[in-house]
Each structure stands twice: as C-alpha cells, then as structure tokens.
Amino acid sequence: MVLMIVSGRSGSGKSVALRALEDMGFYCVDNLPIILLPNLASSLMPRNTPAAISIDVRNMPGSSEIFEKVLTKLNKKFSTRLIFLDANHNTLIQRYSETRRLHPLSGNHLSLEKAIDEENILLEPLRSRADLIINTSEMSVHQLSEMLRVRSLGTKERKLSMVFESFGFKYGLPIYADYVFDVRFLPNPHWDPKLRSMTGLDKPVVDFLKRHSEVHHFIYQTLHYLNQWLPMLENNDRSYLTIAIGCTGGKHRSVYIAEQLADYFRSRGKNVQLRHRTLEKRKE
C-alpha cells in the first residue's frame, strides 16, 4: 500500500497538495498526529487504497527520535513517501498578508516573521527525511497539482468526470454546477394527463419529446457547445465537470435531456456520471 506523508511550512500549499492527491484517488486525512500514523495505515491496509496524510508543526512529537521510530516502522510495511512543501520567507509573509490568516505558532505571542522562523526549525526533522522537497514560491495551484500528479502517478493524464444532473427549478438551483441549462421552454409532458405521473425515463415520455424538433435542436446545440470547449476544460486541472439540466419539476424534460447528453459522451469513451436529483428525492 502506498502511504504519502505531506508536510511542510504553513502557507506552502499543504491543503492544495492534499486536495490534489484526493482527486487522484488517495484516501486523505488532514493534520493527523504522527504517533497515530501506524494505526491508521494498518486499518487502511485491507482496502489496499493509497493514502495521503498531512502533518503540520502542531502535530510534531516532542523529539525527532519519535518521528524516526514511526517512519522506520511504517517503511517496513508500506511504500512510504514523504513530500515536504517549502516556500521562500518573503513569499510566506506575502501569502499570510493576502489571506489574513493566523500562523499556527502566532498564538505563542510571536510575530509572523518569528513564527515562520520558529516553524522552520521545528520542521527540520521532516525536511531532512523528505523524499521530495517542492518549493512552491513561484508555482500556481495548478502547477503544484500537476507536479504532484506526475510525481505520484508517473503521468500527466487525468480523466475528467462529466457529471450530468437533472433537477427541478421549483426545488432550487444546484449551486455546485459548472453549467446550468434551462429547458423549461421545451414542450412539457406534464400537461398530458397520461404522461403526468411518468418520468423522462419512461418510453411514452421519451416518444413525446422525440416528436418535437426543438428538443432535437436543443440537444444538438448543447452537444456542439460542450464538444467545442471540452478539450480546454479537460486541460484545466479539474476532476469534475458538472452540467445541470433544469425543468420546472425535474421529472420529465430535464431527465430526458440529461439522459441523452450522458449517453452521447459515454458512447465516446468519456467518464460519465448521471444523477436525477428530483427522482432520487422521491425514492427517499
């Protein structure tokens, strides 16, 4: 089992690194005390899932000998790698000034500069044992994520997951969606008493919508739009692209359209997920 330990100076990008590793399929735990590392790793071993653990200065043991013993113990059972993130002194000061966050050691009545210096000393045992040291001073969030992907997986490729979700406007917008398409202008099966109790998954509703040319035009133009920009989105360091399709109740039109879009991209080898928000709520 691969066990990635992520540490480094506060403000150097540990949270970004942990999110990137999580996107790569690692089971991630933030700010775990070092003495608990062996127990956690052992509990994860049956899953054979790669894990990433972040450690900051607040979780350092009282002596470097304790850390050495823990790391030696882990190396006997796991494929352990220690990544240490660093940044220049002035860069760290600038980042803290921009975010206005408190340094973890500032609570000890230290100025920001002294807290940064003190942390640097305390983290030296970790830095000295690191398999990889990354200075993030001149790196963007995307560049750090890309470097970790290449170093961890040995490839720059990561497959984008396209999530198609139908919903009803009457129940509210999905705020996490990257794109929202409103299909309330399309012919509504709700007004046909025979179709009202059905959904966009049922053949009579599907046949009803297929008979209308505007439905075909909407699907065609939406596919054209997504196909046009998908290559750039795939290269934009994202794991998910969520496309929400909304009609009034989230039962007929949006369900059918989401199904059609998902089928198209699935047939072209894309990693596709499909959700019907309103229909799932009805089952609960």
Curated annotation (Swiss-Prot):
The keyword Protein biosynthesis does not apply. Residues 266-284 are annotated as: RNA-binding. The keyword Nucleotide-binding applies. GO terms for molecular function: ATP binding; GTP binding; RNA binding. ATP binds at G8, R9, S10, G11, S12, G13, K14, S15. GTP binds at D56, V57, R58, N59. It holds the Pfam family PapZ_C. Keywords: ATP-binding, GTP-binding, Nucleotide-binding, RNA-binding. Belongs to the RapZ-like family. RapZ subfamily. PANTHER family: RNASE ADAPTER PROTEIN RAPZ. Homotrimer. HAMAP family: RapZ_like. Modulates the synthesis of GlmS, by affecting the processing and stability of the regulatory small RNA GlmZ. When glucosamine-6-phosphate (GlcN6P) concentrations are high in the cell, RapZ binds GlmZ and targets it to cleavage by RNase E. Consequently, GlmZ is inactivated and unable to activate GlmS synthesis. Under low GlcN6P concentrations, RapZ is sequestered and inactivated by an other regulatory small RNA, GlmY, preventing GlmZ degradation and leading to synthesis of GlmS. This is RNase adapter protein RapZ. It comes from Hamiltonella defensa subsp. Acyrthosiphon pisum (strain 5AT).
